[in-house]
């Protein structure tokens, strides 16, 4: 690796497995020091042991403000500051709108939206003290377009996209950038029950976690120094449009002349 994140300290939520663990490993590989949190303590401790002195694991329920404060304090105490936040933690639940329980609605809002808000709020002070920062909110393509039966997930991911923009405007003068990443289907434990062909993608496959992590590293680095308030889509072409695969088999000479 090329050391693109040397001198930076990052905090990652939901970092014990899946995309979060991939983000942690990718940033450490590029020279960052990383504090990461989750509620999956055994898995988190195993990742921290693998990364040795470059990482610290903390228990972090993203709905609890005090645990965010403790995670930030760990980063500042252990590594001397905080420059990057990756709001990665999230959950998915599904159901028809008429049967969608209020408790499930509230739960997904608490984790996917309030958790992001609390994370951003917690890191502003140390990032202002550092004179710079990059906040990376993991949204989804469901933050760009709706999906049947994913009402809570879609609502929260759209909201994260909006929160990204309002905070980017507010924090920009302090040198803090805020962007959102919008993955499509990614091969993680949270989505292992989803058929890989559920979305018709231009590339014809689901993403590997590292393909999202590569974008996280870019946004954490100074390479993205003029990017803020923006959406970065990594979805294999899912939201680009309908993939009319049948058209590709039609001979050009046999196509009708369409007049509009």
Swiss-Prot record:
The record, for PROSITE patterns, names: ADH_SHORT
One Gene Ontology MF term: oxidoreductase activity, acting on the CH-OH group of donors, NAD or NADP as acceptor
How does this protein's activity depend on the pH of its environment? Optimum pH is 6.0 for reductase activity.
Q: Function, please?
A: Probably involved in steroid metabolism. Catalyzes the oxidation of androsterone (3alpha-hydroxy-5alpha-androstan-17-one) and 20beta-hydroxyprogesterone (4-pregnen-20beta-ol-3-one), and the reduction of progesterone (4-pregnen-3,20-dione). Shows a preference for NADH. Has no detectable activity for oxidation of L-3-hydroxybutyric acid and only an insignificant activity for reduction of acetoacetyl-CoA.
| Organism per entry | Mycobacterium tuberculosis (strain ATCC 25618 / H37Rv)
Note the InterPro entries from the entry. Answer: NAD(P)-bd_dom_sf, Sc_DH/Rdtase_CS, SDR_fam
Which pathway features in its UniProt record? Answer: Lipid metabolism; steroid degradation
Which keywords does the record carry?
Lipid metabolism, NAD, Oxidoreductase, Steroid metabolism
Entries under Gene3D superfamilies matching the protein: NAD(P)-binding Rossmann-like Domain
- Active site annotated at which positions? 153 (proton acceptor)
Family matches, as Pfam families: adh_short_C2
What is the protein's quaternary organization? Homotetramer. Homodimer.
Q: Which reaction does it catalyse?
A: androstan-3alpha,17beta-diol + NAD(+) = 17beta-hydroxyandrostanone + NADH + H(+); androsterone + NAD(+) = 5alpha-androstan-3,17-dione + NADH + H(+); (20R)-20-hydroxypregn-4-en-3-one + NAD(+) = progesterone + NADH + H(+)
Q: What result is annotated for mutating residue 69 to K?
A: Maximal improvement in solubility
Please give the family membership noted in the entry: Belongs to the short-chain dehydrogenases/reductases (SDR) family.
Q: What outcome is documented for mutating residue 6 to T in this protein?
A: Maximal improvement in solubility
Q: What is this protein called?
A: 3-alpha-(or 20-beta)-hydroxysteroid dehydrogenase
Entry's EC annotation? 1.1.1.53
Looking up CDD domains in the UniProt record yields: 3beta-17beta-HSD_like_SDR_c
Q: Give the CC-aspect GO terms.
A: plasma membrane
